[in-house]
């Protein structure tokens, strides 16, 4: 290689003075190698190195990261700690491994200790097995089973039917009397007439009239007993018979059956004297030669004449003997207030008269027609709107000639009525065609009715007579207020009232008569103020009556 020519003023002694590095000629000695050496900058021979080598204070050294240092002997060392977790351990800066049986260290290698039925096949742990143990299609250890065993729930179980069953996890025979266990053997408890024969079979001991016929127990019979349809019967003839599965004796009067036995029904004049039937004679009668004769002295107005007992009748006694049988009768003047009724002389009473409790003639009191139907003056909670007995209702109907004047008021007691949210609330009453109260009639939402336990009847003082059998005269006229026309004005009356009696809470009050499809009905409807207690003061209404 031809060397470059130096400038005349170039000083070849390092370091070069004031020359542009690019102008310095290549003057590397021919003995310098490019392996580990380089000319950098140009004209300067230097070491060629990469990380982690570097220079420090003109000396070649190493770049040291965290945990590395050079000790005083110039050796590279580390003060970094190695963190380990179980089963790896670190003792005196030596990393180890914790293990327990069946793991073991053999020839500096970790191995597994095992016993039968385990085995190692092709460097894999295997299990020696024989039937019924097997490996199923899912490579799971399984058990070959057959009935009565099953493993549907993952547990090997024994299927059993009565009389076999599990008791305290033990297969047992289930039994009840007369079976019992005797020295762990199932035994039959027997009592006479059962017994064990010589061949250990259960036999029946019997004696006449029982007998064995065609290997069946039967009964020897003689008259009056017979066997029919497998039943023992008793042949009977009158007066004996079988009634209600009991032997009975047929009797005709005067015989009868009592708790103590057969008896005779004795009428007047007959009696029992010891064990004999005798005639019971009263005063004036006697037995003479086996016949009944009179034994009396006749006192007036009776007389005994010609073997006959006779009655003497005066001409002014109002008594007469009439008819073929000569019956004694009273000669009553029926046009003068007397009459014969049920063989008794009675007084005939005209209008306005009656017999009092002492049997005396008295003037009949004037009949008073009820004029008021009501729920009493102060009822208990008696109406149901949203829940049972959630309100108290005062309803009064007063009959006045051809009109009824009525009033109604309501006091909320509980539930929804204390804070109602509906637009309107109604109270309805239904009546049958005879004007009697109709209970359990279906109602719609936001409608109330009297509860079945409520009192409704004619006013009787401050209470009510609930014996109302006909109250048509109190009902709305079916001509003036036709049925099923409750939505038409002819059946309505409309006015206003004040909720809770507060003049600042005016609400509408509507009365509708005979809105139901049959019978009679009353319906009262009020507008609701939202969440305001539904207390309605006394509201008046009137209508034309049926009668």
Swiss-Prot record:
This is Fiber protein 1. Its main location: virion. Forms spikes that protrude from each vertex of the icosahedral capsid. Interacts with host receptor CXCAR to provide virion initial attachment to target cell. Fiber proteins are shed during virus entry, when virus is still at the cell surface. It comes from Human adenovirus F serotype 40. The lineage of its organism: Viruses, Varidnaviria, Bamfordvirae, Preplasmiviricota, Tectiliviricetes. Keywords: Capsid protein, Host nucleus, Host-virus interaction, Late protein, Viral attachment to host adhesion receptor, Viral attachment to host cell, Virion, Virus entry into host cell. Belongs to the adenoviridae fiber family. Pfam families: Adeno_knob, Adeno_shaft. Homotrimer. Interacts with host receptor CXCAR. Interacts (via N-terminal tail region) with pentons.
């Amino acid at each position: 290689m031809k060397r470059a020519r130096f400038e005349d003023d170039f000083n070849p002694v390092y370091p070069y003075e004031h020359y542009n590095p690019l102008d310095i000629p290549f003057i590397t000695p021919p003995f310098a190698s490019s392996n580990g050496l380089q000319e950098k900058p140009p004209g300067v021979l230097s070491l060629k190195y990469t990380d982690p080598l570097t220079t420090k204070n003109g000396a070649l050294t190493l770049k040291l990261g965290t945990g590395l240092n050079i000790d005083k002997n110039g050796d590279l060392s580390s003060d970094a700690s190695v963190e380990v977790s179980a089963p790896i351990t670190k003792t005196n800066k030596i990393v180890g491994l914790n293990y327990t049986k069946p793991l073991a260290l053999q020839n500096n290698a970790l191995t597994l200790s095992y016993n039968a039925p385990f085995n190692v096949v092709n460097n894999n742990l295997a299990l020696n097995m024989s039937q019924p143990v097997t490996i199923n299609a899912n490579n799971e250890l399984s058990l070959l089973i057959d009935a009565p065993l099953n493993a549907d729930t993952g547990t090997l179980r024994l299927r059993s039917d009565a009389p076999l069953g599990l008791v305290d996890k033990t297969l047992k025979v289930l039994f009840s009397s007369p079976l019992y266990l005797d020295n762990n053997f199932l035994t039959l408890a027997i009592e006479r007439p059962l017994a064990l024969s010589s061949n250990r079979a259960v036999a029946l001991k019997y004696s006449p009239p029982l007998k064995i016929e065609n290997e069946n127990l039967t009964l020897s019979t003689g008259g009056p007993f017979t066997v029919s349809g497998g039943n023992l019967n008793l042949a009977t003839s009158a007066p004996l018979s079988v009634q209600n599965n009991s032997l009975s004796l047929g009797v005709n009067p005067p015989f009868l059956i009592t708790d103590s036995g057969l008896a005779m029904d004795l009428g007047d004049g007959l009696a029992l004297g010891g064990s004999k039937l005798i005639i019971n004679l009263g005063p004036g009668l006697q037995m003479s030669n086996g016949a009944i004769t009179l034994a009396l002295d006749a006192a007036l107005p009776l007389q005994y004449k010609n073997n006959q007992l006779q009655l003497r009748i005066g001409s002014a006694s109002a008594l007469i003997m009439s008819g073929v049988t000569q019956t004694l009768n009273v000669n009553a003047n029926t046009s003068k207030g007397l009459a014969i009724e049920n063989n008794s002389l009675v007084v005939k009473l005209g209008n306005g008269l009656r017999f009092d409790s002492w049997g005396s003639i008295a003037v009949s009191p004037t009949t008073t027609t009820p004029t008021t139907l009501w729920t009493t003056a102060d009822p208990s909670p008696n109406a149901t709107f949203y829940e049972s007995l959630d309100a108290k209702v005062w309803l009064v109907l007063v009959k006045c000639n051809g009109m009824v004047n009525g009033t109604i008021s309501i006091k909320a007691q509980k539930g929804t009525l204390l804070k109602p949210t509906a637009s309107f609330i109604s109270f309805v009453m239904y009546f049958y065609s005879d004007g009697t109260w109709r209970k359990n009639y279906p109602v719609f939402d936001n409608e109330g009715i009297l509860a079945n336990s409520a009192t409704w009847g004619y006013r009787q003082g401050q209470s009510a007579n609930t014996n109302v059998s006909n109250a048509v005269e109190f009902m709305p006229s079916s001509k003036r207020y036709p049925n099923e026309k409750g939505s038409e004005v002819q059946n309505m009356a409309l006015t206003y009232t004040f909720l809770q009696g507060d003049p600042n809470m005016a609400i509408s009050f509507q009365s509708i008569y005979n809105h139901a499809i049959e019978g009679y009905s009353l319906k009262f409807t009020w507008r609701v103020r939202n969440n305001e207690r539904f207390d309605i003061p006394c509201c008046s209404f009137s209508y034309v009556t049926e009668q």
